Amino acid sequence: MIQRLGSSLVKFKSKIAGAIWRNLDDKLTEVVSLKDFGAKGDGKTNDQDAVNAAMASGKRIDGAGATYKVSSLPDMERFYNTRFVWERLAGQPLYYVSKGFINGELYKITDNPYYNAWPQDKAFVYENVIYAPYMGSDRHGVSRLHVSWVKSGDDGQTWSTPEWLTDMHPDYPTVNYHCMSMGVCRNRLFAMIETRTLAKNELTNCALWDRPMSRSLHLTGGITKAANQRYATIHVPDHGLFVGDFVNFSNSAVTGVSGDMKVATVIDKDNFTVLTPNQQTSDLNNAGKNWHMGTSFHKSPWRKTDLGLIPRVTEVHSFATIDNNGFVMGYHQGDVAPREVGLFYFPDAFNSPSNYVRRQIPSEYEPDAAEPCIKYYDGVLYLITRGTRGDRLGSSLHRSRDIGQTWESLRFPHNVHHTTLPFAKVGDDLIMFGSERAENEWEAGAPDDRYKASYPRTFYARLNVNNWNADDIEWVNITDQIYQGDIVNSSVGVGSVVVKDSFIYYIFGGENHFNPMTYGDNKDKDPFKGHGHPTDIYCYKMQIANDNRVSRKFTYGATPGQAIPTFMGTDGIRNIPAPLYFSDNIVTEDTKVGHLTLKASTSANIRSEMQMEGEYGFIGKSVPKDKPTGQRLIICGGEGTSSSSGAQITLHGSNSSNAKRITYNGNEHLFQGAPIMPAVDNQFAAGGPSNRFTTIYLGSDPVTTSDADHKYGISSINTKVLKAWSRVGFKQYGLNSEAERNLDSIHFGVLAQDIVAAFEAEGLDAIKYGIVSFEEGRYGVRYSEVLILEAAYTRHRLDKLEEMYATNKIS
């Protein structure tokens, strides 16, 4: 509604309820346009004066989506929907965009003390999930390195906890694993796993590892099982599975094909078998039945194909799927001249994973080029290299319609790209991304300032593949000022690009300027000391097409529950404040714990459990509330508490039903290097009445202490004892315990009951004399005393005979 108030005054009022009359001039100057100040906005005419005048107005400035050439960059926060072109170095134009010109957001997708870097050109989308592989270590190199990834199932808004894909190399710390090339072909993840030395990061071996990705299939028919057979045949087109891979079945309608199973044999690319626990008398076929099958990445083994030390290779980079059977990986050689850049083509990775073809880009582009990024679209292979020096051009773009046998090539003008240029094809455009290692490094001739605190820039560019001309390519600065927690960033690592729905994702690594390779607070290079190495992975998400969904954005309002709170102690070591409760299995490595209480209910007799890699300890320090008499510690060399899994020692607590008992359980008990002795002299027995040894094997006679200083009541043997002994006869017999073991040995000895009866006949108590024992309802004898008494009795009789000869009582 407009009202004429005079010849020069115009007022208006909005139709919105409650609105008032306003001066039209006031309304028009709320947001000013650069065009109001004479700017051309054609990207060629210098609009610096118009920009200065607009900024002097103090108003917010709308660029109306145009590009304005300037001789110095203005305050970008004052502008909306504006792009500037500025030549910081003459002849090297760069473009800078304000809010509203590009719809993009930056996310930090890892946050831990490891040196998280190298996501180069190996990110991918599988089953609507974005996978961002990278490597996490404790420094630049392979020290404590794990090949890892994070995943996002919500379009990059939240990311998973990092998952390790490799353990330490068996020969660590001499060598360790490393990976710069990874991707999915059909339904398997393929990765070039390099082995490198810790000392020099030198490549010593290459191996192609592959493993099925996790997925869920809803199928109809295709399972058969013949009568009187345990094997069932599964038909799944292009299953991509190998022997030993994990599969899970439900609702199969075929006996035995259910739950977790493993691939038994592979018939062809569409059929495999599983071994069921049973067989039936008739043929089975689930034709027409709906059923489900799942595969698992983590539960399946790696298939590892050793490729040895590939000659003329510094690193293998990037990955591009060619078809359902093969893929390519890029590589470069920069250790010795001449430099080499190219690809490895694996035409049949499923059946012949060790077979590959090596191809190079044109030789004139190889000097000072490195780390190729590779993609394959519609029968065309694209490859982009990065430059390695600031004084010479190195970045180049190549395409091939015959997988690297012939090439069409372009050189990027002006700019030197010290990081890789990952890309994706959207429509007819290649959309490329790259980040500086240090602020103002993008242009040719820039110094190497990686180890200074700065604000490295991130750029993107479009190149139309139909025009195939890089002379007028526009590098657009989309974000900078990356931070690593509390420290300004310096270096930015190599990246990956993927497209999902209406968005393109640039995933790249940042780096703390206190680079652990050289200097800084953390000279020990320990990721768990101080703040570790705040080197993390970022994702820049940019909209590239209209999205027909109502909204795919949300605010993450949940309380984070996947991380343990830590605090920096006064000693520079991160601390977890006690108490801390764990409700599931705990796996630790190089852990120092002052006091640890574990509570678990693994069985009725076990209060607490501690599980270590390859060894087990079950702890019952405190009295178990559910069963106090079960207090004990079990140490088992096997994989459980049962002695059948390995040798075992059980230590009973004072409240145990077998208080303070130690039980040893094993096939052998061997002692090495020292004598076996009791802690206290002459206090304890070896064995007991109900815990007897079958026999003892000795190398010599045992020694029994017979020192007179250790005896009392010394006298000659009573003649009544000798007379009683004369009543004891020697016997031969078999042993019941041996008969139970099907042994039939004849033994010689005395019977304890005969000794007791003989002594009683002379009015003596055999138990008192110690030659006979009676404990726990069982008689025993001391054969050393039996022999002594027999010898004494024999001597006694001989003495009597000699006396009779001497007195002529016998002759």
Swiss-Prot record:
Gene Ontology BP annotations: adhesion receptor-mediated virion attachment to host cell; symbiont entry into host cell via disruption of host cell envelope; symbiont entry into host cell via disruption of host cell glycocalyx
Enzyme class: hydrolase
Residues annotated as site: Cleavage: 706-707
GO molecular function: endo-alpha-(2,8)-sialidase activity
Domain Peptidase S74 positions: 706-808
Top-level taxon in the UniProt lineage: Viruses
InterPro entries reported in the protein's UniProt record: ATP_synth_asu-like_sf, Endosialidase_beta_barrel, Endosialidase_beta_prop, Endosialidase_C_dom, Endosialidase_C_dom_sf, Endosialidase_N-extension, Glycl_Hydrolase_58, S74_ICA
Alphabetized SUPFAM superfamilies for the sequence: Phage fibre proteins (SSF69349), Sialidases (SSF50939)
Site (Binding to sialic acid): 332, 335, 339, 368, 388-389
Positions of the catalytic residues: 371, 386, 437
Database matches in CDD domains: Peptidase_S74_CIMCD
The EC number(s) this enzyme carries: 3.2.1.129
Keyword Magnesium: no
GO terms for cellular component: virus tail, fiber
Keywords noted in UniProt: Degradation of host capsule during virus entry, Degradation of host cell envelope components during virus entry, Glycosidase, Host-virus interaction, Hydrolase, Repeat, Viral attachment to host adhesion receptor, Viral attachment to host cell, Viral tail fiber protein, Viral tail protein, Virion, Virus entry into host cell
Ranges: BNR repeats: 150-161, 286-293, 398-409
Disulfide bonds: none
Protein family per UniProt: Belongs to the glycosyl hydrolase 58 family.
Protein name from the UniProt record: Tail spike protein
Organism per entry: Escherichia phage K1E
Higher taxonomy: Viruses, Duplodnaviria, Heunggongvirae, Uroviricota, Caudoviricetes
Gene: GP90
